[in-house]
């Protein structure tokens, strides 16, 4: 009883739904959490951090694929998802250049050097968060949110 197996890279199961549609749905699903986070923190840097991490992730993917003479895949929205997830994982007081550096690391080192979409060994946004946490521990861990402290309202 011998079977012929065809060994090929993933994905092994295919569907009519394209990965670009799935990534777009993920972006749409993340938008309410993003807007609530920006509103909740009320920090002037929060929306800029989202914009910078997302734009630098898309730009890093575009530049890398152009330099390596690969087909440009920014239309699949995976870089947008990575930039958005990274922004949601970072403290809102983080300098914008660190967010951009994290996005570039996520796209080039964690995603593209391992083969691109679906071939990476870990989530690029979380890999970038680990990189930033190891590289800039003070900025990544020191975040003080102004809170209201005092006795309960019944004590008044």
Question: Residue spans of the language-model regions?
Answer:
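Alpha-helical transmembrane segments in multi-pass membrane proteins
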Residues: 25-33, 49-61, 78-83, 87, ...
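Cytoplasmic-side transmembrane-helix entry/capping segments in multi-pass membrane proteins
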Residues: 72-82, 98-104, 119-129
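Charge-biased, low-complexity intrinsically disordered regions
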Residues: 66-67, 71, 85-86, 90, ...
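C-terminal ends of transmembrane helices
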Residues: 10, 59-71, 107-118
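Transmembrane helix interruption/hinge and helix-loop junction motifs
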Residues: 40-46, 90-99
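Long hydrophobic alpha-helical segments that form multi-pass transmembrane helix bundles
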Residues: 118-156
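N-terminal signal-anchor module of multipass membrane proteins
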Residues: 1-58, 62-65
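Non-transmembrane, aqueous-exposed alpha-helical and coiled segments at domain scale
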Residues: 1-2, 67, 71-75, 93-100, ...
């Amino acid at each position: 009883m011998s079977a012929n197996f065809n060994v090929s890279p993933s994905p092994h199961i295919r569907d009519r739904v394209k990965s670009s549609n799935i990534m777009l749905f993920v972006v749409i699903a993340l938008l309410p959490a993003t807007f609530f986070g920006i509103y909740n923190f009320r920090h002037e840097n929060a929306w800029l951090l989202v914009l910078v991490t997302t734009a630098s992730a898309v730009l890093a993917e575009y530049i890398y694929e152009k330099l390596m003479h690969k087909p440009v895949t920014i239309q699949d929205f995976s870089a947008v998802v990575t930039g958005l997830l990274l922004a949601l994982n970072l403290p809102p007081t983080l300098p914008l250049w660190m967010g951009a550096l994290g996005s570039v690391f996520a796209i080039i080192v964690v995603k593209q050097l391992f083969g691109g979409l679906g071939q990476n060994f870990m989530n690029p946004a979380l890999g970038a968060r680990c990189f930033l946490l190891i590289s800039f521990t003070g900025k990544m861990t020191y975040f003080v949110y102004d809170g209201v402290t005092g006795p309960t309202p019944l004590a008044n």
